[in-house]
Amino acid sequence: SSWSAEGDIAAQITAGILGRSPKSAVTIELVRTIFLLSVDHGPQVSGALNTIITARAGKGLVDSLAAGLMTIGPRFGGAVSDAAREWFDGVQQGLEPADLVETRAKAKQFIGGIGHKKYRLDLPDPRTTILAEYATRLDAHPYFDFAKGVEEITTQKKGNLILNVDGHIAALM
């Protein structure tokens, strides 16, 4: 990258997330990649659609953006936090991926970061392929390994119960 670390927004955001300067260029590159892969889903997703509808209804910029932001949730744009909690708790508690899947199935609960309406095993999300490559570049990736173990089980049940882009982001960060 031609940016210096001081002018690199990805490095600055990474430092803000970590609470310190990042030690690894790979970490900064991962954060930059996450932003690039997450920035635009087109006008058909709820956050974009509600922003457009609100603006066309005559509301101002702030109201329109707020309308879009209010639709971020577990089914669109907000699954990263739930997925991060799943992977972190699973690893910290020494669970096997099968334990998490069984617990959620018995409770009839979704697993954050698992599942997609469009993508499935035979039609993978190209963003997840790019993100998965980062796991091979990290010194350790226990959360990613745990999440992939969950995916291995869930995709045996249904092909679209893949580790989605939010699940990948959560597992890598």
Please state what every model-predicted region is.
Residues 1-173:
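Hydrophobic alpha-helical bundle cores within soluble ligand-binding/oligomerization subdomains
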